[in-house]
From Swiss-Prot:
Transport of potassium into the cell. Likely operates as a K(+):H(+) symporter. This is Probable potassium transport system protein Kup. Belongs to the HAK/KUP transporter (TC 2.A.72) family. It catalyses: K(+)(in) + H(+)(in) = K(+)(out) + H(+)(out). It is a multi-pass membrane protein. It comes from Pseudomonas entomophila (strain L48). The gene is kup.
Amino acid sequence: MVQASSHAEGGHEGKQGAARSMGLLVAAVGVVYGDIGTSPLYTLKEVFTGGYGVQVNHDGVLGILSLILWSLLWVVSFKYVMFILRADNQGEGGTMALTALARRATAEYPKLRALMVGCGLVGASLFYGDSMITPAVSVLSAVEGMGLAFEGIDHWVVPISLVVLVALFLVQKHGTEKIGKLFGPIMVTWFVVLGALGVHGISQSPEVLKAFNPGWALNFFIVHPGMGVAILGAVVLALTGAEALYADMGHFGRKPIARAWFALVLPALVLNYFGQGAILLQNPEAARNPFYLLAPGWALLPLVGLATMATVIASQAVISGAFSLTRQAIQLGYVPRMQIQHTSSDEQGQIYIGAVNWTLMVGVVLLVIGFESSGALAAAYGVAVTGTMLMTTILVSAVMLLLWKWPPVLAVPLLVGFLLVDGLFFAANVPKIVQGGAFPVLAGIVLFVLMSTWKRGKQILVDRIDEGALPLPVFISSIRVQPPHRVEGTAVFLTARADAVPHALLHNMLHNQVLHSQVVLLTVVSEDRPRVPEHERFEVEAYGDGFFRVLLHFGFMDEPDVPAALKLCHLDDLDFSPMRTTYFLSRETVIASRLEGMSRWRGNLFAFLLKNANGNLRFFNLPLNRVIELGTQVEI
């Protein structure tokens, strides 16, 4: 009986584990694969109507299908799913997590480290451009299907798209926890429909299956040597969203993402692309919109509705990704501090950043109004996608060779293969800069300048403050000679350098002529890892005479809640009771000068960013009624 009960319990646990795995897989489909899953809406349409000169004939269709298939297999299946997903930073993925990993890998090589940081900032900058283009091109391509169902409705495509997109951005501050539970089932339905439509098309012209032979892709390059590389600029549209597999790894883990790709997403995409190819062989006129013309007439309107929902979900994924990337960048010191609002009491990762949301919304609206169609926007899309992919490969190269210590004889050929393919896709998109691709490039340049200026400015600011800093042992020795009046309580002084006296402490002594019975010099350290366990959160050192040095360590995915962290400091001599603890902050006002380190215009830009950044009070969750802020001017 006991044995039977044990088997029953084991079976129950097994069923629970299977149900959880299936739940993670469905959730991953809803969040991770929205972008790449909506690519069939516009990819083949752009290939054959985007001015590349590809003929809608037997060889042209099979050549393009083979290129798309083998691009999906090499870039997504092999490079991302089987390789890049293993380059996690304690389970987290994405540009900033990978940059932190590459910084650690190149710690002994300052110049190489600076190059890796630069690549990371470029990749992050292009991702923000992608976060504007994805909602615009996806929703436009879905709504354009209405033009096939109703004649004369084309002029309504832009207004309807704008209504959908603006509504999406307006609901962000309320969170998407409730409707987010529907994303997975809707996207699973979407991929099933993609596959079913593909099977329907293939059944009418099975010869498209010949495109599984990579010889058709090679033949296309041989027959069209000039067009071959250029057409990669359109083929890459089938790969948009591949970066999301890596960026969202922290939410679901590598295995559910990989299983969802091989079990559902990849088969559905391949079937649909081949189905579109089949109807193009039967009717070359279908090139104007092969996705929607693949569907029977009765299914057109329901398909437009489902496609619109799928594109909204894809847009939501990149918007959430932009919020997450921004939080990581803030923690790592690349972006000024902003107000971060949590939209879910259960899910820590569900956040809202107003400044990012409204900036993205303005960018998306301008893109829709300026480009008016998904075809026109496709040129801008490829530059952002391929640039981000290329930066990811460069960062992974450093991690593989210097952190994982892979033998060069194994690593170099693999990396050369990745870089060669990424380089070809990027080169194919460079000419598009004059056709609309300038937008993500300009957006990337602006964001790169902002992030690099902030990072450099903060370093110069710390150096300037440190120049005249009084060493802490000297200060303690001086107060032993002339002891000031001590008052009850704990004074916490936030400082970037724990071995020197912060300006706020000196100003307090100068003006008030008193010291608290306990003086804590607190330094918050941002780690190159996502989370720091509680037992590694703090370091405490007692200097005597009531002075303590405390270091708090936070990862780039941790909430830097200083009062909560200080409660973990278990020392008999330290008392962090809320009503006995006062926090002293320094508020620096920057004056741009001609001193070495930063040009005048960048100094002014940094001063503007610093003035408008969220201060330590909100960022560290300090109690408003227990904070005293003292100002100081610093030249940079």
